[in-house]
Amino acid sequence: MLIDGHGRKVDYLRISLTERCNFRCQYCMPEKPFSWVPKENLLNFEDLFKFVKAAIDEGITKIRLTGGEPTLRADLDKFIKMIYDYKPDIDLAMTTNGYLLKDIAQDLKKAGLKRLNISLDSLKPEVAAKIASKDVLKNVLEGIDAALEAGLKVKINMVPLKGVNEDEIVDVMEYCKDRGMQIRFIEYMENVHAHSDLVGMHGKEILDKIKQKYEIEKIGRQGSSPAFLYKLKEDGYIFGLIDPHKHDFCETCNRIRLTAEGYLIPCLYFDEAMSIKEAVQAGDIDRAVEILKTVLANKPKENRWSEDANEASNRAFYETGG
């Protein structure tokens, strides 16, 4: 069992397979030009899998593949199958923008992927294009349909932004409700790489938009999930709100992050990290596990997105998967 320095059980590993992305979302990507990490600097799937096996043996029960955009990584389905074959009952999920899903959803399901979180910030082509800096909506909607047809469990993530997509909060929720998908509204997380003119909506503002049409009931958090759940009184539809600015957001954090270059990151907000790359490539898995435990021992108690401070993180979310 893996325990962090504050006594929290850690059983959830998030793996960023690449920092590259085929979108340039305003709340994630920098305005100024930047260079990707060379592909040869990334851990290959064989070395990644060595660490994944060790992490599972130490108590990891849930793995989420992220990016950047994970579907850009070649042989993604083969890596998923490697994990599934080693531990068929592992909770294996992926976060994606959905743009490439139409042609690969069936393969991912067959390989052993169980769940998907797909970003959908607007149902208006022009607004989706503004946010992603690319005409994306048609492909994303087709990807969602393909994932559902493949039998994957799908949740939708939406980041409400003032003056951009705040008028679509209910529309996107109803789109999800009609298709049996849970939507999770994610508060915009301030970071130095996002466009400087963005203003996110706080949880209360998001709920107020929904209350203009629906009566809602609080459910609460389930397990270690960061989402606070609510229910529509009308039909029992459940949606989530991820609010990192709340003081209790970090109390049940059970996750550790691994970047595509092999850095273990204890918290999305903080820059501190340790690399397992050399240890894994040398076949010294015991050393990699030691590094994992050291990082967990230094895991902070909470982030700094407090309701009062609203500090901006230096961490690039396209490196760590958000």
Swiss-Prot record:
Keywords: 4Fe-4S, GTP-binding, Iron, Iron-sulfur, Lyase, Metal-binding, Molybdenum cofactor biosynthesis, Nucleotide-binding, S-adenosyl-L-methionine. Pfam families: Fer4_12, Mob_synth_C, Radical_SAM. GO terms for biological process: Mo-molybdopterin cofactor biosynthetic process. Its cofactor is [4Fe-4S] cluster. SMART domains: Elp3. GO terms for molecular function: 4 iron, 4 sulfur cluster binding; cyclic pyranopterin monophosphate synthase activity; GTP 3',8'-cyclase activity; GTP binding; metal ion binding; S-adenosyl-L-methionine binding. It catalyses: GTP + AH2 + S-adenosyl-L-methionine = (8S)-3',8-cyclo-7,8-dihydroguanosine 5'-triphosphate + 5'-deoxyadenosine + L-methionine + A + H(+). Binds 2 [4Fe-4S] clusters. Binds 1 [4Fe-4S] cluster coordinated with 3 cysteines and an exchangeable S-adenosyl-L-methionine and 1 [4Fe-4S] cluster coordinated with 3 cysteines and the GTP-derived substrate. InterPro entries: Aldolase_TIM, Elp3/MiaA/NifB-like_rSAM, MoaA, MoaA_NifB_PqqE_Fe-S-bd_CS, MoaA_twitch, MoCo_biosynth_MoaA/MoaC, rSAM. Residues 5-227 form the Radical SAM core domain. Pathway: Cofactor biosynthesis; molybdopterin biosynthesis. [4Fe-4S] cluster 1 binds at residues 21, 25, 28. GTP binds at residues 14, 64, 95, 155, 255-257. [4Fe-4S] cluster 2 binds at residues 250, 253, 267. Its EC number is 4.1.99.22. S-adenosyl-L-methionine binds at residues 27, 68, 119, 189. Transmembrane segments: none annotated. Monomer and homodimer. Belongs to the radical SAM superfamily. MoaA family. Catalyzes the cyclization of GTP to (8S)-3',8-cyclo-7,8-dihydroguanosine 5'-triphosphate. NCBIfam families: moaA (TIGR02666). PANTHER family: MOLYBDENUM COFACTOR BIOSYNTHESIS PROTEIN 1 (PTHR22960:SF0), MOLYBDOPTERIN COFACTOR SYNTHESIS PROTEIN A (PTHR22960). This is GTP 3',8-cyclase. The lineage of its organism: Bacteria, Pseudomonadati, Campylobacterota, Epsilonproteobacteria, Nautiliales.
